């Protein structure tokens, strides 16, 4: 069973299933990531009940009803009624809008039925869902003080960040399939509608009282001043696996052997099955050029999402790739300097930007009008007729846009909450 197809209401062998199959490894490995994070053979200290509780909470916060109901059903099969009630109570409390920066923290220590580990996981999840740019090393210290070890923290971050991808793909495909604009109707949506972006019903303060603890690292970095058009380094807040300690399974999960030199990938290798599936998903979404969207526009979507979420590291990487693939240097610099509302110089790039921004917001603001605008502006995709080869191409462009935008809601959350960017000496 393909979970994304199920939640999006896509019939096996149907039109959208066939278009999704243009990115077969992305489709297969999105499912493999679900298995690695929700149904692993060895859960370690991160139990199935905890995984389902976090997933149900996160899906509820993202306000995509099909996903929220699915994960609540999984939780109900694996946990006691008091845990299900705790998730519902926490979801109602956490309702807000995002992405935000310098936002109030919402904490969940007093949720009935949630122990210290689960409450801390909810605290961390709320941060990742709505304002990951506000993460600091103390957020990981808070998890360690509640009993989470480094491996568990990486798996927890991967689970939350993966769901940020999955629910956006589901919502985008539902809109593409004409099943309505389903976001914003899950538990807590009414409360969220009454909260301005960057605030939260029940927000405690901008300082939740968390502390650096255990194995958490506060690295010495030269932080970038804003968004830059040169490369950046990145340093983790919990120890990466040392090169000499990498197991064959962890090395295999890197896919690209040269990534053993990256602390980021050696950190994610603490959960090798999730890393492998995530990497295969990434590579197929961005580098499989069998139809669909051109490479420059895929990288544009990644840069827009990273700019909106506040991820300077990801923006630095993908702005360069956008330009390398033919993107306009001046326009990309303007995006970095001025933000996502800047003039991008063409109807097509503006339509991509608008769709990527709408998909990134919580609750999602992505609707059929964004699809229509992309179709109308895409080269060779204007005035298509349903059921034609041109219509299939237009759908492939839209699915690439949905996948790229959704994936960077995954990538940004890992980069922003497990470590921080560092300006190389040559650029200081």
Residue ranges and their predicted role:
Residues 1-428:
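Hydrophobic alpha-helical segments
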